[in-house]
């Protein structure tokens, strides 16, 4: 392939805590093997969909900026995603294949499962459509980034046109 878009992952934070070895296998080891295979081909670009919220940890100050985050993941899932970002940069540093990494947070859109552990937009919408009150954890002062799935598709395509970039 000329461009490889890698969006596959074991995406459950809960599973990553319950079975960190499984998470390591799916979110670090397999993508590294994929990159090694792609290096031996004529692939020119590797575009990776990482995870924003889980790799940066919780913000120290609200309202927040990028500098206000603790910078440390709080789950094996976040650790694997953060380390894979580092591996991509390291592995492709001296290769003919360039990369783009998109650290996406809380992607939402049509057909998203309202019964999963993540996807607060679909969970809240599903509850409201069923005349149920959404459950808010914490004190309600938490902050999160959200991005619509069509905007993610546009960002992935645009990122394939740039070399060796990290997008937050």
Predicted feature locations:
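SDR active-site strand-loop-helix element
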Residues: 4-10, 46-52, 102-104
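NAD(P)H-binding glycine-rich loop region in Rossmannoid oxidoreductase-like domains
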Residues: 1-26
């Amino acid at each position: 392939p000329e461009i490889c878009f890698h969006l596959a992952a074991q995406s459950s934070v809960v599973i990553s805590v319950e079975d960190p070895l499984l998470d390591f296998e799916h979110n670090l080891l397999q993508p590294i093997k994929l990159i090694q295979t792609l290096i031996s081909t004529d692939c020119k670009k590797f575009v990776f969909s990482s995870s924003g919220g889980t790799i940066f940890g919780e913000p120290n100050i609200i309202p927040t900026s990028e500098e206000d985050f603790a910078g440390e993941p709080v789950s094996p899932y976040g650790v694997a995603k953060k380390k894979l970002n580092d591996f991509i940069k390291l592995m492709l540093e001296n290769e003919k294949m360039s990369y783009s990494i998109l650290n996406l947070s809380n992607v939402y859109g049509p057909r998203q499962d309202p019964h999963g552990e993540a996807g607060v937009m679909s969970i809240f919408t599903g509850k409201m459509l069923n005349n149920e009150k959404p459950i808010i954890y914490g004190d309600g002062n938490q902050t999160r980034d959200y991005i619509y799935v069509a905007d993610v598709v546009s960002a992935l395509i645009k990122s394939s046109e740039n070399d060796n970039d990290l997008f937050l």
